[in-house]
Amino acid sequence: MNLLIMGLPGAGKGTQAAKIVEKFKVAHISTGDMFRAAMANQTEMGVLAKSYIDKGELVPDEVTNGIVKERLSQEDIKETGFLLDGYPRTIDQAHALDAILKDLGIDLDGVINIEVDPSCLLERLSGRIIHRQTGETFHKVFNPPANYNEEDYYQREDDKPETVKRRLDVNIAQGEPILSHYREQNLVHDIQGNQDINDVFSDIEKVLEKLK
């Protein structure tokens, strides 16, 4: 079974990816892990990627796509299948993945898309606060401190509502063309992510049992 998992930041994609891998024994291929392994093993693409990273430059798409192809060419993929997590990030990468899979003779079986309303994600992601003295992390809504005094807490720049909204907007703009691309191929399975973690996974399980 060969799968992609998609979802906006905060939608619970990482949690569900781990559950899918545990239950269905597919290889979990995340972008970060792929890059680290390729660089550690000094593969052709790994060496190229490291040269860009060492200079503080963005790794170009052709190198990222090359690393994906190297990973999908490995023997374990034929036996277990895969769950791609964090790639493709752009429509160009989605087209590149189509070409890679065709070249390797691999069919994509499904795209799991975890849907959560962006306004819920904004609340979820921008509610994190940190105690100035202890460094303890709380959430204004879901895990508030017992005695909340605003002056005693701060927010990281990354967690401020305006920063979170910008990040969500970028992800939505990049993600919509990718989802449309896979919808045209009837591969997308939308999963309601605004429910209990186990209920989300139960919905995913029902989809994947049919794809097995």
Swiss-Prot record:
GO (cellular component) term, any one: cytoplasm
Keyword ATP-binding set for record: yes
Keyword Hydrolase applies: no
Keywords, ordered alphabetically: ATP-binding, Cytoplasm, Kinase, Nucleotide biosynthesis, Nucleotide-binding, Transferase
Name of the top EC class for this enzyme: transferase
Location(s) in or outside the cell: Cytoplasm
Family membership: Belongs to the adenylate kinase family.
Protein name in the entry: Adenylate kinase
Gene: adk
